[in-house]
């Protein structure tokens, strides 16, 4: 009994000492609140990708193409994803598109949400121009809500502007929305720039009419540009209306390359930014797209001046712009020719199979 009594007293005093010590520790090391602002810092990944007639099965069964895109999305994890040159989804009897009805949902199920379950939704799409191809915008519905869209141009193809808003944790109480406008396009291809110059110039004129000042805005897609002195490119970065000039991040912000630029004539000077082609040989893995390896920089993401301001709610993260899968050594090589350490080999193979185009991506910071 003496042993048990002594043991009990020892445990009692240990318990008291622990209880006394606990408040002291809390006072010595103040606990920071888990959340100091309703808007936590965040990073938004923005990606534009020409998917080469995705939907018409020219490159292979849609289920197979879904699996390639699933691999790419699982790696890149975009929060805003623009797919351009999707085979048009028929919405009427006179539409030219050959994608199956409901193909946008099929992309969600078989590719995007298969990679990241429950994450993605898509915006409304149009094809008033009755083109064979169209653009689809997807977004991370855990970070953004869809507000509205407008068709800005319907010439050869539709160019739509989408209005998204950031999902503030306190949005239901404050009703304070931070909008982000995304213009997604695929201009006319070909060596003669007249059609694409007209499309982009009309787009810029429409933007000027819409907004008394440029909001948080991105213009992205496949511009089919050969050089920076084309009228369409100049309409974006050097518009006659000085308050409506956009930035091409590798040039204007990161200063990695300089104007004037002609990647058609000197691709080696822009090797890490080239987006056409992922394939060295024309008929491999299929004959649905161009070969010739990396030679053209058709795909861009332009940002409004507000997004270049580090104090803005949305702001470009310097040097985040990059071409996924392009390590700068693709001038005479396919994307999956080794060595290429810019992405895992499985992703490189998926890029090779999915399209003859490389995707481009940048990151936006989100600050309280």
What name fits each language-model region?
Residues 51-56, 86-90, 127-132, 142-145, ...:
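Solvent-exposed loop/turn segments at secondary-structure junctions
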Residues 37-46, 139-146, 156-187, 364-368:
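Beta-strand-turn-beta hairpins that frame and shape the catalytic cleft
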Residues 209-217, 225-368:
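Metal-dependent phosphoester-hydrolase catalytic domains
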Residues 4-11:
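Sec-dependent signal peptide recognition
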Residues 57-60, 92-97, 148-151, 175, ...:
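Short, solvent-exposed loop/turn and secondary-structure capping segments
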Residues 2, 16-135, 180, 329-331, ...:
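N-terminal, active-site-proximal structural segment of metallo-dependent hydrolase catalytic domains
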Residues 51, 60-76, 81, 104, ...:
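Extracytoplasmic, non-cytosolic globular domains
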